[in-house]
């Protein structure tokens, strides 16, 4: 972890295709992306290079939310996603860039996340904690293999 950036690494017992789908599908994305205690509403999600997204994280305890949006900069199916985003709140200035690598390994997918340009008013450790929770939720979504009845 360096100032204004965080880096995370996980190995997930699911295929890169399944993990990638969790990023690409708006309904799936809204279930695992917000940290614990938050819900997510997606107003726009055009998952393609140059496509825009807009969403809101809502604190379930207080009902207060913060909105943010951005653009998908690079997408390579089942391998790589890069997007920019910024908060609507003028007190959280600047644009962040997030890069996600998916690498097929013997037990599933090696996932690496790097987020850069985090606003100075957000402590990096708070952002890191949020990402840890987010990735726990992602893992709980993609690791189970549930057959159709």
State each model region's role.
Residues 3-9, 16, 52, 67, ...:
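Intrinsic-disorder/low-complexity, polar/charged segments enriched in Ser/Thr/Lys/Arg/Asp/Glu/Gln
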Residues 46, 51-55:
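N-terminal glycine/threonine-rich, aromatic-flanked beta-hairpin/loop signature
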Residues 19, 23, 29, 53, ...:
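Hydrophobic pocket/interface hotspot
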Residues 1-39:
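Hydrophobic ligand-binding cavity/cleft-lining segments
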Residues 110, 117-149:
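A conserved amphipathic terminal alpha-helix motif
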Residues 24-25, 34, 77, 142-144:
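Residues at helix-coil transition
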Residues 30, 36, 44, 58-105, ...:
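Hydrophobic-ligand binding "helix-grip"
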């Amino acid at each position: 972890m360096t100032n204004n950036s965080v880096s995370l690494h996980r190995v997930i017992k699911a295929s890169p295709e399944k993990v990638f789908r969790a990023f690409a599908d708006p309904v799936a994305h809204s279930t695992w992306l917000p940290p614990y205690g938050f819900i997510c509403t997606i107003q726009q999600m055009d998952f393609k290079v140059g496509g825009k997204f807009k969403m809101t994280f809502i604190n379930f305890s207080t009902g207060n939310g913060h909105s943010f949006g951005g653009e998908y900069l690079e997408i390579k199916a089942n391998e790589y996603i890069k997007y920019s985003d910024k908060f609507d709140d003028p007190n959280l200035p600047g644009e962040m860039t997030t890069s996600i690598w998916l690498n097929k390994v013997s037990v599933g997918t090696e996932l690496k996340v790097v987020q850069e340009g985090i606003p100075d008013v957000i402590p990096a450790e708070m952002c890191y904690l949020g990402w840890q929770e987010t990735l726990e939720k992602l893992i709980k979504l993609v690791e189970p293999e549930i057959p159709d009845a």
